[in-house]
Structures are given as structure tokens and as C-alpha cells.
Amino acid sequence: VPDIAASDPQISSDQKTITVKIKKGIKFSPPVNREVTTKDIKYAMERTFSANVPNPYATGYFGTIQGAPKTPAKGIPSISGIQTPDDQTLVLKLTQPKGATVAAALVMPLTMPVPPEYAKKFDAKNPSTYNQNVVFTGPYMVQNNAAGSLTGWKPAKSIELIRNPNWDKSTDYRPAYLDKIHIDEGNSDATVASRRILNGSALVQGDGAPPAPVLKQAATRFKNQLQLVPAGGTRYVAMNTKIKPFDNADVRRAVFAIFDRNAMRLTRGGSIVGDIAWRYIPPGIPGFDEAGGLNPPSSLDFASNPAGDPAVAKKYMLKAKAAGVPVTADGKYAGTEKLLMVGTNADPGKKSAEVAANQFEKLGFKLSFRIVTQDALYTKFCGVPKAQVAICPNVGFFKDFVDPESFINPTFNGEAIQPANNNNWPQLDDPAINKAIDAAAILAPGPERYKAFAKIDDDITALAPAVPWLWDKTPLIESKDVQGVADNYSTVWSLSFTSLK
């Protein structure tokens, strides 16, 4: 459903020009207080190519816009291919016939309008501080002061959402029933938080997940307070291919083979939360069936046993030994270094990370295992290549839009590796994979495109840069007096549709 857009994007026959019309009457929240124009969307897109506002999606999905920088720019670049012939028209000119992909990617947050006259002073800092002074166009805003500073945001503690006084209901399809929303952050004990929701009043879950014991209880005692949303996503354990011994594909295949993926799934609640994964494109996304569906081919013997196969793991470790990796005669890693593994400190992710650590230890790996907040996991460790994290057990990717490219390009294309906010957690940079992704990305939606990405998915799986273990269904819980509405795109509660009974 179009939001700020007045209608769906129009794509030229050669797939190199995209035209979008936006609605009139949509205004920024205080202190900007003016109507949104396409110049604000142009600036929003341009700023994501700046080194001050690094965003892996910029080059991953929008890198074919004419004039787009190939690497993060100093300052905010002016991109010739993002054009605004009038205040309600946005035109994107592309260097390659990728109109279908770029148009689909316009749903992503980096296209949310940003007023340049207000944001430039924040974007001039490295990193930008606009996120601490952000303005809004929807029904809600984070409480702020007259200068725009977010007084309603207490980092790692809470967020206060209030109504945006400039929101005009006639321009929006969202009902926005609630007048005020309080968000608690920093809930390191997910069991306590989840039980508080189920037994409390006017509460819904945020971006955390209820631990497995609570989920089982919710499925039996609180059935009317539980929704399972097909997530269109894959959870996996990433191995840094830039760090020894994970620069060796046979070592990675051995890790994949030894992994008890069912034990991993049990940490989140068992079969209720999804099917055991063996590759990266999930069910419900074009390319899934083309790549073999639920069952791996016999050629991928390391992916065949969800409970793990020590014999197959040993076979691949001995292959790695022949290539010079220090491995004992019985197939255990003989290196003495401790490999940095960073997991989340909240269940069920914490338990998943602990199970993952056990799998590596089965093969003789010595770990330096750190647990941090979910936010820090990405912003300071797994999303920052210079942090030199060898193993990220709590990563995964969920649909940016319903197309296989969104699961392959930002996560496994070496050209998408970023110094911050990096989503290619294994840092896979295989020239053949990169070339195949670039070739498939210009294909129009349809069987040829989906088969091409299925083949790439197979090729990536064969390299084993990560161990996929769950095709996710997201469990959402709410208090008994809440009429929650799930957002099937982002797989969280939609606060703009949720109400109190």
C-alpha cells in the first residue's frame, strides 16, 4: 500500500527510469512544520551514500542510480540520477536495467523524507547525529523539544511516542487509535518481560522474542494472546571468511556438518517457530522452490543431517588439513588461538548463541565468547568489519521486499561490505558470486530471474559462509486487553493499527 507515494512507481520499458508521484498535504513534525516534497526524499537517499551516514542498502540496492558513489562519500553527494522535476515528482535514472529491483526497494527506510535545511548540521558530523534529532511524517513522533532534540528517547531505557500534531488523517490509511505509546528498552531478561506482557495490561512485545518456555506456555494457556507471523527470513550463524581458519571453505563445511540445527531451533521454541533451514532464500520468496524447497540435495552432504553429522564434519576437517589448516588426525581443529564470538545477552538469542558455541567446541575450536546487547551486537561488533569478530551466532536476514535479491545481494555480495552497518556478516567476497549477483539483478521479475538467484543461493550454500538453521515464523505476544495487528512486512506489531479493547 503506498504511504507517502500517491501510487505505485512507474517503470520505463527499458527498466532504466522510475517515476514516483507523492501525496500533497503530508507535513513534518515539529520543529520543521512544513509540507514534504520530493526534494526531501532526494536528500534522504543522497545522505545514505555519505561516510557520515553509512548504509549498506544504498550501494546494494541503489548503486545503479546515475551518479551514485561506489564508496561512501565525504559529505552529502549530489546524485544526478535522483531528479525532482516538481515538488510531487521523483524520477530515478539508472545505469542498468534494474528498475524492478530499485522500485521494490523504495519501501525501505532510507527513502523516508529528511528535510535538508534541518538535517544538514547533524549530517555534517561523523557519525551523523540526525537519529537523535529526527523528525517524522506519520501519526506518531518521539517526544522532542523546540530545537528537535529527542527528549523522549532515553538510550537503552525508553522511548516516548506522542501524536504528531501535523499529521493529517485524510492523507493516511493508518487509523492510529492510540494517543501515546511508551516503549521500554534494555529488557535483558526476556522471560520476565514476556510474562509481564502475558499477565499484564496494555502491553505488546517489541523486537525481542519470547523465550522457548514462555512461548510454549503462550501456545497453551494464552492462545488468544499469541500470533505467529511468517517472517520471510532466515536465521544463521555467520563465520568471518576473512579470519583464519574460516577463510578455508572445508573448515566452514565441517562446521555446517557438525551443527545440531534442531537444538538451535529448540532454543526458540521448536517446530512452532519454523522449519529447519539449510540455505538462505526462505519459504514464500521466489527462488525457494527453484533451489530445492525444504530438502537439501545429496551433493551437499554437510547440510543433510539437521542433528549434525560428526563423520561428515571429520571428512571436511581432514580436507582442510591437506590444505595446511592445523587439524588433528581425528578431525579436530589444532589451532591455539581464541576466536572471538559475539552473541546477544537476551534469551532466546543468548541460548541460541550458547548452543552455537558448543557446536564449534565439538570440533576443537577455542572461543572468546562475549555477550552484548542486541543493539551493540550489530553496531559495535558483527556489523563492523574492523571489530574482527570471527563468529556471529545471532544474525539472520528478513525480507526487504518480496524478491530473492534482497536475501542474497546485501548479505553475500562482496561489493556490499561496509565499514559500519554491514550486513555481509561472513564478509564473503567471491568474484564469481559477485558477478552472478550483478547479472541476476538486472533480470526482470519472472522465472529466469528466480532460477538465477536460486542457482546463486546453491553456490553460496556450497561455500558454507554461514550455517542457516531456521526459516522463521515470528511469535508475537500481547496483553489480554490489547487488539494487536501484526505488520506482515516487518513482522512486529503495527502500533499504528493496534488498539486497546
Show which residues each predicted segment covers.
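Detector for C-terminal structural segments
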Residues: I258-G293, N345-N358, K380-K501
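A bilobed periplasmic-binding-protein/Venus flytrap-type ligand-binding module shared by bacterial periplasmic
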Residues: I162-N166, V229-A254, I258, T267-R268, ...
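Append "and occasionally in soluble cytosolic enzymes with long acidic Gly/Pro-rich linkers
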Residues: S149, K157, I162-R163, D247-N358, ...
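Gly/Pro-rich hinge or "lid" segments in bacterial periplasmic/extracellular proteins
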Residues: I76-P77, P97-A100, A105-A176, K180
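Surface-exposed binding/hinge segments that line
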Residues: S13, T17-K21, V36-K121
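Ligand-site clamp/hinge motif
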Residues: S128-V134, E160-Q217, K366
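Ligand/substrate-recognition segments at binding pockets and active sites
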Residues: K154-K157, R174, N199, A320-F397, ...
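N-terminal lobe/hinge region of extracytoplasmic solute-binding protein
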Residues: V1-S13, V135-T137, M141
